[in-house]
């Protein structure tokens, strides 16, 4: 028996050694850098539900990693931030990224602290605003994705706040999916976006605990008539509760129509929301901890969806295109916005660069 066990052990060690050798033979060194610049000028003097301000920042993310067996990666990176016009601080902040990535034709998985842009879901401005995508660009947790011939599905868990004296405990679960009803032309589709956000206390703040769920099923159609058209109809249902002020969940809801027309990178994007105030705690239920309401700490979407006038309309005219072998992207647009009380506008300019080089670590025989 002991001889048999020794032989089995030696066999397992040999197999593991062979696999390790094969993995090392396929190993590559990854070296790269990401760059993002974001300019966001908002003119909301006549609007009740938006604040006039200018956001202007840049982010450089050098990164290094290893790849093995074609599908596996370990990556370490550092986000280096600078706010334009702030000459008193060299770097506004520096935040790490460390993550494992598995990416095959059908399945992808991530664990650690990884870029939000790895998400495939079409999360609208209701859940994630343009500024949140830039300034909160990391997911701290795990994510799984399935990529099929007729659509995709994904789910992620983001532990975005640690329980301590300096921060509140916060975590967000997001999921999205899309299914193309006609597989040949891929014109008609249906999908959903989902977000569950738990906004808890800290060691210094024991109240103001919020639970928030948002569900956004939609149907859409894509077609070409000289221009590329994409039309989507959404139904938004939310469940929200401030535990200190409400015994039951508030359930604001609404509908949204999206129409996009594009050609040669130039696009017009029309978005019309009709419904209830989707952000009931944004300005209300003031407390000592949040004298002006919970604001953007609780809501990641555009503040205009907190309108009490049952309407929000935004029209974007812009240009969005990749250059130089899909290594540099320019996205800029001018937007007119109406919240039921007045008109406002904003101008967005974003520039992104994605560079990545892989270097084989094994010598070819």
Per-range role (PLM):
Residues 2, 22-103, 260, 345-364:
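Beta-barrel outer-membrane channel/assembly domains of diderm bacteria
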Residues 44, 108-178, 198:
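Surface-exposed coil loops of outer-membrane beta-barrel proteins
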Residues 86-89, 121-123, 203, 243-246:
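A short acidic (Asp/Glu
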Residues 70, 131-135, 302-304:
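A short acidic, glycine-rich active-site loop
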Residues 4-17:
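Sec-dependent N-terminal signal peptides
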């Amino acid at each position: 028996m002991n001889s048999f066990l020794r032989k089995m052990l030696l066999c397992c060690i040999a197999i593991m050694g062979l696999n390790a050798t094969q993995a090392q033979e396929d190993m590559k060194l990854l070296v790269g850098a990401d760059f993002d610049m974001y300019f966001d000028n908002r003119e909301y003097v006549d609007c009740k539900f938006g604040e006039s301000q200018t956001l202007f920042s840049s982010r450089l993310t050098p990164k290094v990693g290893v790849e093995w067996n074609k599908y596996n990666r370990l990556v370490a990176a550092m986000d280096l931030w600078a706010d334009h016009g702030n000459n008193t601080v060299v770097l506004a902040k520096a935040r790490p990224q460390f993550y494992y990535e598995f990416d095959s034709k059908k399945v992808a998985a991530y664990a650690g602290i990884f870029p939000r842009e790895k998400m495939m879901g079409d999360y609208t401005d209701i859940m994630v605003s343009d500024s949140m995508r830039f300034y909160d660009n990391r997911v701290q947790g795990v994510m799984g994705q399935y990529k099929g011939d007729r659509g995709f599905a994904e789910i992620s868990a983001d532990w975005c706040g640690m329980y301590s004296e300096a921060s509140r405990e916060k975590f967000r679960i997001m999921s999205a999916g899309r299914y193309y009803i006609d597989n040949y032309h891929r014109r008609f589709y249906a999908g959903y976006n989902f977000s569950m956000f738990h906004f808890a206390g800290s060691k210094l703040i024991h109240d103001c605990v919020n639970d928030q769920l948002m569900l956004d099923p939609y149907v859409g159609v894509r077609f070409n008539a000289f221009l590329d058209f994409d039309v989507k109809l959404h139904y938004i249902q939310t469940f929200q509760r401030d535990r200190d002020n409400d015994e039951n969940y508030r359930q604001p809801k609404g509908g949204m129509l999206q129409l996009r027309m594009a050609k040669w990178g130039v696009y017009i994007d029309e978005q019309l929301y009709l419904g209830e105030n989707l952000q009931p705690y944004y300005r209300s239920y003031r407390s000592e901890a949040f004298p002006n309401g919970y604001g953007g700490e609780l809501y990641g979407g555009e503040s205009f969806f907190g309108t009490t006038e049952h309407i929000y309309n935004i029209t974007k005219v812009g240009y969005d295109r990749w250059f130089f072998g899909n290594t540099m992207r320019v996205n800029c647009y001018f937007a007119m916005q109406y919240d039921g009380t007045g008109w406002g506008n904003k101008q967005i300019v974003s520039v992104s660069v994605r560079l990545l080089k892989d270097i084989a670590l094994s010598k070819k025989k």
